[in-house]
Amino acid sequence: MFILRQAEISDIDVIMQIEKDSFVPAIMERREVFEQRLNVFPEGFIIFEDSKNHRSAGYICTELWDCIPSDKDFFAVGHDIKKLHNANGSALYISSFALLKEFRGAGNGKMLFGSALNFFKEKFNTENALLMVNEEWNAARRIYESYGFRKYMVFESAFPAVSGSGFSCGIIMKKSFSANAE
C-alpha cells in the first residue's frame, strides 16, 4: 500500500536517489532542475511513499501547459519549467515518473501511475495529458497504453539507445480526458 503526498524541497535527496536508480546518467535530471520544479509547481510533484515503513518508493513530476509544443527542446532533460508552465494550462505534461528498482515488477508502477493520473485529472481539470517515453522502454509504454495514452508524435534520436550504441526515438504519448476522447 502506498500514500501519495506532495513532494517538498526536503525530499530532494531521495528524489535524486530514485532518479539515479531509474535512469542512465545521460538522461538523469540535475538536482537544480528538480529544485526549480518543486519551487515553480509543487502541487504537480508527488512522492509515492510505502505506507508500511514510510519509505519513498518513487515520484511523478508534472507541469501544466497551454498547448502541446512541436519542438523537441521543450521535452528535453533539463528543460526550464518556466518556459511553458501555466497554472491554468489545459495540458498536463508528465515530465518524469520513476520507481526504485525494488518496487518494480509487482504491478506497483501501473497502480501508482494510475492513482497519480486520477489525482492530477481531478485536481487540475485538464483536457489532456502527455508524456515522452523512449521507444525501447516497452514496460513503461504498456503502462501508459493501459491508461489510454496513444502515440501522438515521434522525435528522432531523443534518447541514448538501451544498447549503449546510438540513439532511439522519443515517443510523445497523449491521452484525452474529454468525454469524446480520441
Which residues fall in each region the model found?
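A short beta-loop-alpha structural element at the N-terminal edge
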Residues: F2-I15
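Conserved acetyl-CoA-binding loop-helix of GNAT-fold acetyltransferases
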Residues: L99, G105-F119, R142, S146
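Conserved acyl-donor/pantetheine-binding loop and adjacent beta-alpha core of acyl/acetyltransferases
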Residues: C61-S96, S157-G166
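Conserved beta-strand-loop-alpha-helix junction that forms the acyl-donor binding cleft
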Residues: K101-R104, A129-R141, S157-S168
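Glycine-rich phosphate/pyrophosphate-binding loop shared by adenosine-nucleotide-utilizing enzymes
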Residues: F2, N53-Y59, L92
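Conserved active-site alpha-helix within GNAT-family acetyltransferase domains
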Residues: K110, E122, E135-M153
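Conserved GNAT acetyl-CoA-binding A-motif
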Residues: L92, F113, F120-V133
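Active-site rim helix/loop that mediates acceptor-substrate recognition in acyltransferases
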Residues: P25-S51, A57-C67, H79-K83
